[in-house]
């Protein structure tokens, strides 16, 4: 691609109130370094768990770190799609997005090292067919498609896959599980801090995905059907991952119940439809400075905090 101009030099400069640059500024303001998290108490807490509890938690962590690594590798075509569309603000935000995914991979690996889990953990994903289909097939296929087809419809499919189903259902459910483990047992303070930091980053990621789908739906109502179809295709797969995880254990640790996590994941997925559909027929200029996508993620976080405070 030949460069003919620089958007940062345009009259009026950049629109710092636009959603992508608002998220970019937020990420800068909330920067954190994995090396600053204290994991010193987590090793003793980890060893105090039963073998069954450690096995469950290791499988949960394996899903997280493999997912963070996958997105670090797969997200680049979305940046190229933003460049092709001439959206510098989105491109700036996605550079931060990719950096944060790499940082999340780093911090989960640091935690595993700190608690002594240094063996090959790939086997913890072998018995999770829905997880492997989502991360080994659906995610890379939907994002790699943008390299040859950066169209709005392809962007909506990619965002629905990653931002709305993987982050917006599967990851949120996993964070909820970690919070339940740590808060109920009052253990693993390093993991608690790790999840808090990552969760804050990923609320911005999900908000960007919602914003992206909303602007495409506002521009062309046909993209609403694209979003709806992709979500309806992948939500059952996300819920199947919970089934797969629970089916591996005759005895379920931590007092967990499959129905609780299925309901949690389904609720987060279904509530995303309303936020996207509310953009139908809206002016694009309104969508660009509408912060409701971020407000939705903050609402989810506040709800979780109330539930966990009650159970503590």
From Swiss-Prot:
Cofactor: Fe cation; Mn(2+)
Enzyme class: oxidoreductase
CDD domains according to UniProt: RNRR2_Rv0233_like
3-(O4'-tyrosyl)-valine (Val-Tyr) cross-link, chain position(s): 71-162
Record has Plastid as a keyword: no
Cofactor binding note of this UniProt entry: Binds 1 Fe cation per subunit. Binds 1 manganese ion per subunit. The iron and manganese ions form a dinuclear manganese-iron cluster.
Entry binding sites for Mn(2+): 68, 101, 104
InterPro entries referenced in this protein's UniProt entry, alphabetically: Ferritin-like_SF, R2LOX, RNR-like, RNR_small_fam
Keywords: Iron, Manganese, Metal-binding, Oxidoreductase
GO biological process, one term: deoxyribonucleotide biosynthetic process
Coiled-coil parts of chain: none
GO MF entries: metal ion binding; oxidoreductase activity
Binding-site positions, Fe cation: 101, 167, 202, 205
This enzyme's EC code(s): 1.-.-.-
Pfam family, one: Ribonuc_red_sm
Quaternary state and interactors: Homodimer.
Family: Belongs to the ribonucleoside diphosphate reductase small chain family. R2-like ligand binding oxidase subfamily.
Function: Probable oxidase that might be involved in lipid metabolism.
Protein name (database record): R2-like ligand binding oxidase
